[in-house]
Amino acid sequence: MQSNIAPFNTASHAATEPAELDIVAMAKAIGDDLRANILRALARDSFGVMELCKIFTVAQPALSHHLKILKQAGLTNSRREGTSVFYQRAGFPAQSLPAALFNALDQTPLPTRALAKVDEIYTERAQQSASFFHNNADVLDHQSELICPSEVFIPYVVETIAEHNASSRQAANKVAKLNTTTLLEIGPGDCTLLAALASQFDQAIGIDSSQSMLNAGLTQLEQNTTANTQNITLEKKDFYQLPNSAEYDVIVAAMVLHHMPSPDAFFKQVKKLLRPNGLLVLAELCPHTQEKAKTLCGDFWLGFAPEILQEHAAKNGLQVKAQQYLAQRNGFRVQIPSFELVTSKPSLS
């Protein structure tokens, strides 16, 4: 298959500062304890209005008033996820005054009670996802086909990783694999992608926190007669509880991130698990408005704008390596971004 992977052009996606900034309005907006804490919370993740009400124990009308002030000052953005509206901090160039205001603001942590409420919200999100997968493992493959069949993106994920592995060996001046290479797939589903990738690695590991999902994947592996699956291991593990041992060369998450309670926490964990110059590859939905994805497939997020994924990656030391977009199907468009863990190069003396 001829390569369709385009290197990512960082210059065209740099944060841009508005032509006119109302610094007075920004300063006034930040100069309120509750609004300052809202911005601190939004530095961690995106939250819905009712989630922010819970975090700060504030009634919805009052909180909406504060959010309006922050948005009018240009300090926050909002996006719709089905019937819910989520807020996040606006992005500014690193050397800009608003970025300096955010940095100063973040020197003071969120109050302990608010942090505890944030953890409660993450737990609720995770339980919602876990409950769906536990109760729908037997029909999820069929329902996922209605959103995006795996055969749509698998060839591109395989190609992305093959090119990365080849360039890594070339950069290290290797003619063959000398070290043990390990792949981790998060939420392997029916294990079709895992089986397609396994031949590129010494070890291919798939993890899921749902035993019913693992059982379904194991059944599919046992019936797979076209691929060598001897080096594949399936493990019942929580992605966020894996030891931070930087032991994986490549991490793959295909149609998984939109189920995660916190995209930012996902990227933080990936950073801890990847080896130097390791690769994260996502197959993920672009933003959409089809609420049926939540009921059919248990989606928490209705896709992601590429710049949102790039911001999460950059915050956690991951650099965009390539970006692909596949043709729209069933009303959904798939993106396949890859991110490389940036490591400092030793200085030559």
Where are these regions (language model features)?
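A short SAM/SAH-binding and catalytic strip from SAM-dependent methyltransferases
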Residues: 250-262
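A short acidic, Gly/Pro-enriched loop at the edge of an enzyme's catalytic core
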Residues: 240-251
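A short glycine-rich, Lys/Arg-flanked "PGG" loop and its adjoining helix->strand segment in the class I
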Residues: 264-279
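N-terminal helix-turn-helix DNA-binding core of bacterial DNA-binding proteins
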Residues: 21-62, 85-92
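C-terminal alpha-helical "lid/dimerization" subdomain adjacent to the S-adenosyl-L-methionine
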Residues: 279-338
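Conserved alpha-helix/loop element of class I SAM-dependent methyltransferases that forms part
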Residues: 148-179
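Class I SAM-dependent methyltransferase SAM/SAH-binding core
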Residues: 184-241
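Amphipathic alpha-helical dimerization/coiled-coil segments
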Residues: 5-9, 96-142
